[in-house]
């Protein structure tokens, strides 16, 4: 498959998608663009919130989308770097893909450091796919309390944090592995529909997951997040390995020009946010370095500088589209009804017709578990985790001492969703990621992990079982003898073990450092390689069939359901759920700092156990932090969870997870 993928996609992905598109369209009038917005079920009147404020329901109009594209194109024209420009709304609907005359057809993914490419390293992918992924990244990583760019993403996914030649020895980025989320195969992420009530339902998938290549920014109107812009002009789709220098990146400058008038508030940009004492990076470009693009108009831009183009599976219109307002029924994310979740601050994911996509329910795994989770237990787990979140001090939000905002997902041992809930303004990326985390904790804690991996048709995937067993010195590893939180599995998924310690071998679920970059992480990337290949062939027109809406080729645990249907995740924020010493599920959290995510999942599970008396965290004796690995003569213990200092806004408590 790898050789076929490399030969087919590398040849076909460089093809221009202009032929698929047609000419440029007008922006229309009344803010609607050329494509009318469907009429979904009206959003219920929200109940007043207790702890949070819901974002105003504001959406980009077609005229505004045209203005954003025109400004970016004006910067590209004056700098002599024709570009592909994509705009999305907050839930990932693609509102425009504009190809300037002379823009590159493809974008090259970096080779492996040692030249031995694996997974998607070295491929050339469609420039349109890269631009969309950058736009999605800018929108999905941001919120009303934080504005992150694809340059920010680059900083937090590499083998050292911050990434720089002088930081060897430091641990990996806090969101190491998040680039393999929002995947085109995800069973959670929605897919483009040409019309009907579900046309704008999100969150939508990304063709390449999240991007680490600079040139993607969020878009705001009056401080309200409304979408993202992504640009590809240089023919490369990579990452920035050194934050100590200042790049002249034309993708980034062109995208930044598109945000003029739609800028992120300065107070919430990434460079106002610190993680472990390190200031995050938002952009290497300044607004003062841009050409004056304020007079650019859509009428001057199309067809003079290029045309809108169709992108199969994402954008199939010859006209600009208006976005949908996040929080409205049409967006797929809205305030929960009282009948759906007890806390008045809760938001849920909907189908556009009023129904909650993931209502609270009991476990589906009665054939595998003597006593599956009951609906009452599932309710307790999500309610208690939500309650911890409302008290938690955020790490990545401004102003300081804001409340954490996350998405929380609960699954059974088969990976079936038993409920999902989120705060009103949690970053969108955390939805798919929280589900990945929940499934990952349940998967690696289960008795079936080794058998499932061995049943995958890829010899590469199969080989990770033997690597784990040899590394841990345990021939029974991955058969349910230990409980793995995502932090534990993440320890084994870094190119150095222990994390960041140069000169040490890789964890058994990682690629060696000589081969590693953000485009091949190890088991995580190997599991979805076939899906990515299928999808890129579909996007380029090489195949009439898209990848199924289920990631990985693992065997089914239930009809049409494998245990990792949206992939796996390798940074902290989940724990398995037990009834005594029997695994019954997993809970995942994502959207704030990794210690906050860990605390919400761990304390939420503990508190649910106190409340219902029948479930809880894994017994201490079987947690992965009882596993000790000998490396270079030293004994290294895996980690289970890590909870933050001064975690709560309403209490001076410390060490809140200790002893539980």
Language model features with spans:
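Bacterial signal peptide processing site
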Residues: 21-26
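Non-catalytic, C-terminal membrane-associated alpha-helical segments of glycosyltransferases
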Residues: 30-31
């Amino acid at each position: 498959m790898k050789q076929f993928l490399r030969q087919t996609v590398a040849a076909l992905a460089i093809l221009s998608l202009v032929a698929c598109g047609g000419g440029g369209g007008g922006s229309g009038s009344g803010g609607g663009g050329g494509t009318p917005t469907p009429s979904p079920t009206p959003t219920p009147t929200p109940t007043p919130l207790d702890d949070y404020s819901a974002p105003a329901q504001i959406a980009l109009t077609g005229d505004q989308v045209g203005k954003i594209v025109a400004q970016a194109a004006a910067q590209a024209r004056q700098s002599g770097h024709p570009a592909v420009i994509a705009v999305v709304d907050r839930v990932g609907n693609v509102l425009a893909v504009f190809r300037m005359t002379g823009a590159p057809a493809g974008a090259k993914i970096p080779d492996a450091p040692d030249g031995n490419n694996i997974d998607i390293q070295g491929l050339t992918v469609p420039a349109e796919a890269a631009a969309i992924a950058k736009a999605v990244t800018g929108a999905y990583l941001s919120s009303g309390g934080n504005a992150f760019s694809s340059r920010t993403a680059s900083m937090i996914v590499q083998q050292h944090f911050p990434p720089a030649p002088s930081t060897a020895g430091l641990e990996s980025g806090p969101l190491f592995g998040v680039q393999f989320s929002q995947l085109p195969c995800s069973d959670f992420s929605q897919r483009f529909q040409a019309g009907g009530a579900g046309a704008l339902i999100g969150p939508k998938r990304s063709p390449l997951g999240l991007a680490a290549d600079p040139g993607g920014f969020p878009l705001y109107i009056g401080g309200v997040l409304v979408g993202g812009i992504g640009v590809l002009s240089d023919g490369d789709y990579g990452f920035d390995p050194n934050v100590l220098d200042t790049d002249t990146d034309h993708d980034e400058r062109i995208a930044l020009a598109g945000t003029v008038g739609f800028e992120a508030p300065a107070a919430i940009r990434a460079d106002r946010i610190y993680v472990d004492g390190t200031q995050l990076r938002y952009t290497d470009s300044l607004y003062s370095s841009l050409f004056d693009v304020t007079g650019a108009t859509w009428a001057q831009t199309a067809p003079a500088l290029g045309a809108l183009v169709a992108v199969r599976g994402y954008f199939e219109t010859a006209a600009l589209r208006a976005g949908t307002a996040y929080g409205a029924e049409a967006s797929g994310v809205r305030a929960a009804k009282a009948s759906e979740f007890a806390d008045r601050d809760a938001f849920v994911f909907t189908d556009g017709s009023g129904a909650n996509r993931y209502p609270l329910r009991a476990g589906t795994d009665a054939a595998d578990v003597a006593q599956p989770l009951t609906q009452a237990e599932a309710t307790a787990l999500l309610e208690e985790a939500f309650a911890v979140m409302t008290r938690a001090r955020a790490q990545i939000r401004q102003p300081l001492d804001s409340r954490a905002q996350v998405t929380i997902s609960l699954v059974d041992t088969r990976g079936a969703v038993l409920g999902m809930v989120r705060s009103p303004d949690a970053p969108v990326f955390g939805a798919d990621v929280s589900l990945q985390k929940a499934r990952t904790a349940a998967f690696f804690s289960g008795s079936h992990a080794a058998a499932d991996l061995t049943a995958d048709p890829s010899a590469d995937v199969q080989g990770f079982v033997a690597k784990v067993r040899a590394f841990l010195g345990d021939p029974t590893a991955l058969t349910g003898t230990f409980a793995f939180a995502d932090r534990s599995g993440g320890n084994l998924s870094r190119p150095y073990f222990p994390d960041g310690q140069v000169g040490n071998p890789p964890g058994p679920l990682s690629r060696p450092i000589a081969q590693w970059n953000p485009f091949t992480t190890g088991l995580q990337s190997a599991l979805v390689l076939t899906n990515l290949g299928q999808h890129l062939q579909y996007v380029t027109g090489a195949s009439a069939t898209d990848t199924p809406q289920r990631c990985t080729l693992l065997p089914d645990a239930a009809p049409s359901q494998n245990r990792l249907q949206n992939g796996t995740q390798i940074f902290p924020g989940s724990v398995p759920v037990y009834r005594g010493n029997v695994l019954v599920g997993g809970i995942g959290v994502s959207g704030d700092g990794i210690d906050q995510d860990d605390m919400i999942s761990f304390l939420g599970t503990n508190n649910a156990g106190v409340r219902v008396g029948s479930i809880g965290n894994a017994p201490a004796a079987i947690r992965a932090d009882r596993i000790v690995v000998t490396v270079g003569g030293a004994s290294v213990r895996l980690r289970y969870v890590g909870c933050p200092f001064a975690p709560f806004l309403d209490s001076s408590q410390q060490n809140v997870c200790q002893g539980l």
